[in-house]
Amino acid sequence: MTNMRKNHPLMKIVNHAFIDLPAPSNISSWWNFGSLIGLCLIMQILTGLFLAMHYTSDTTTAFSSVTHICRDVNYGWLIRYLHANGASMFFICLFLHVGRGIYYGSYTMVETWNIGVVLLLTVMATAFMGYVLPWGQMSFWGATVITNLLSAIPYIGTTLVEWIWGGFSVDKATLTRFFAFHFILPFIITALVMVHLLFLHETGSNNPSGLNSDADKIPFHPYYTVKDLLGVFLLLVTLMILVLFFPDILGDPDNYTPANPLNTPAHIKPEWYFLFAYAILRSIPNKLGGVLALILSILILSILPLLHTSKHRAMTFRPLTQFMYWLLVADLLVLTWIGGQPVEYPFIIIGQLASIMYFATIVIFMPIASMIEDNMLKFT
């Protein structure tokens, strides 16, 4: 069996990636989220596949087909809510994974990090298109508002929007193509995940100290496979509590009303995991400026390696930068709250201040804090 594991062309790849992989001996539970994201992806693909068997991507029957899944299909309600709440768990794991990467300086592995940023953008695009499929009020108006943002692009904006819509408004053609993209993108994400892992295994994992751990490695199996299983158990328990007791807590009540182009909801908002970006978008009165800020709120992650000014890799021994980091986390929570509030005083000004703080903390405060810490080391 050992020979087969080490010599068989396919088994050899699995062995080097998950069994005999040399891993740092001190990585904490914050390193569990990579495997949990993988689990979420597998779960979303499987539940999505079963939903696609019963869903119809037609404006007249889409809403009814989702109702049919919940009422008539065996355990259809379970599959549907696993898929919807699984997306929330996916994003919780993603945000924690990115947060860990920023805290421990994992962005210094530039190729792995940049593939990760591309993955985050792709997952966000997939989730947005998935939200449109049930064809409720928030699905329709969310799709209309977000796709309409592309009209801010000079010269080609309006043509581009109509090309994406497949007509002069969000309609049957839009729903059909969104379903097609929502189906194919998870497989593209899976391919990107493999590239992400390929680059990660070129350099090896980072660790909480931020120091080189080549002198102290342990095999991935059984140590980290067992450790990951605990994370898997906790994730599944949390998800099942969410699905079985509070299935609609993260959804919008408006999405239980069929889409009506003649009736605009009082407050159009995306799913909770996009609210921070939505708040940044709304904080700028200019349409093009808002769109650029929205895109930059994610793309700013890709310039983190350039903004790293410290001699230390991780924030473990950098209290000043740690303070700035937790300020950024608090700011993101404020932005998430603001994104769900109506556009009125005092929420407008809070959103604008929080948006300025978001970019300023990443681009100005954290690099300056790192430089101050480096200078303080000279006096010790």
Curated annotation (Swiss-Prot):
Binding site for a ubiquinone: H201
Annotated InterPro entries: Cyt_b/b6_C, Cyt_b/b6_C_sf, Cyt_b/b6_N, Cytb/b6-like_sf, Cytochrome_b, Cytochrome_b_C_euk/bac, Cytochrome_b_N_euk/bac, Di-haem_cyt_TM
Residues that, per the record, bind heme b b566: H97, H196
Cellular component, GO annotation: mitochondrial inner membrane; respiratory chain complex III
Membrane topology of the entry: Multi-pass membrane protein
UniProt-listed Gene3D superfamilies: Cytochrome Bc1 Complex, Chain C
UniProtKB keywords: Electron transport, Heme, Iron, Membrane, Metal-binding, Mitochondrion, Mitochondrion inner membrane, Respiratory chain, Transmembrane, Transmembrane helix, Transport, Ubiquinone
Cofactor binding: number and manner: Binds 2 heme b groups non-covalently.
Record's miscellaneous remark: Heme 1 (or BL or b562) is low-potential and absorbs at about 562 nm, and heme 2 (or BH or b566) is high-potential and absorbs at about 566 nm.
Designated name of the protein: Cytochrome b
Organism whose genome encodes this protein: Phodopus campbelli
Gene (name only): MT-CYB
